[in-house]
């Protein structure tokens, strides 16, 4: 009985931790969308998709509205700076981060500590940004898509997309940043559910890492993504599963 209860407690703690991580990620998506396109989901399609993901995850409406207000700067009591950090991870991979913080010094110290403790180094502005290109990225769950790949590609290209990449369980549609909203709206009109859409920094070339370097890199990326002030993390790593 006692051991069973301990197992139940551990399982619940793990589920709570996973739920908290999901809420944290979605909150960051909502804040970013509201910051870039405003607080109205009816006119900001990126925000509409992020809010839909929040509701699907059973995030309380109070949390959703707070994230929108913070992202759009509607809360006059809070002032945030937006910063881009660049650096190198194990194996020489490039890493870029979008930061939103109310204390630049605290965040810089935290991020520098995470890098140095896990085989990386925080660099100067511009040290790796030339290895990335800003693009719109739309993620679609293949299992939720009512049409085939060819039809999906035709709809996306007609709407202004640049490319479609097929993954094991999903599709990734790439657009110019200013075409992202338009393509997402056309997909919705065609009955294609969009899992996520964002303007992201996509690497133009990749660096292969494996073994201990890959493990160390994954730990570094996880810790960066878990930090409250880090909105997005991008890397040009090609991580081998071997």
Swiss-Prot record:
Q: Would the keyword Transcription be found if you checked this record's keyword annotation?
A: yes
Q: Which GO terms describe its cellular component?
A: cytosol
Please state what the protein is called: Probable transcriptional regulatory protein STH1004
Key words, A-Z: Cytoplasm, DNA-binding, Transcription, Transcription regulation
Which molecular function GO terms apply here? Answer: DNA binding
Q: What highest taxon heads this organism's lineage?
A: Bacteria
The family note in this entry says:
Belongs to the TACO1 family.
Location of this chain's protein in the cell: Cytoplasm
Q: Which Pfam families match?
A: TACO1_YebC_N, Transcrip_reg
Q: Which GO terms describe its biological process?
A: regulation of DNA-templated transcription
């Amino acid at each position: 009985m006692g051991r069973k209860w301990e197992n139940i407690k551990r399982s619940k703690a793990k589920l709570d931790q996973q739920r908290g991580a999901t809420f944290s990620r979605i909150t960051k998506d909502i804040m970013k969308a509201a910051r870039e396109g405003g607080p109205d989901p009816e006119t900001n399609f990126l925000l509409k998709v992020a809010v839909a993901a929040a509701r699907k995850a059973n995030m309380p409406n109070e949390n959703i509205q707070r994230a929108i207000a913070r992202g759009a700067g509607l809360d006059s009591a809070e002032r945030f700076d937006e910063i881009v950090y660049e650096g190198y991870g194990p194996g020489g991979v490039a890493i870029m981060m979008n930061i939103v913080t109310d204390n630049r010094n605290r965040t810089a110290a935290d991020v520098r500590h995470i890098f140095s403790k896990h085989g990386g180094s925080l660099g100067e502005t511009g040290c790796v940004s030339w290895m990335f290109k800003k693009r719109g990225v739309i993620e679609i769950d293949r299992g939720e898509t009512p049409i085939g790949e060819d039809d999906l590609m035709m709809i996306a290209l007609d709407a202004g997309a640049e490319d479609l990449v097929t993954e094991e369980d999903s599709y990734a549609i790439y657009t110019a940043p200013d075409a992202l909203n338009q393509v997402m709206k056309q997909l919705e009109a065609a009955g294609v559910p969009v899992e996520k859409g964002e303007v992201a920094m996509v690497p133009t070339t990749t660096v292969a890492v494996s073994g201990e370097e890959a493990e160390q890199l994954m730990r570094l990326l996880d810790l960066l993504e878990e930090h409250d002030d880090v909105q997005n993390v991008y890397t040009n790593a090609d991580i081998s599963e071997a």
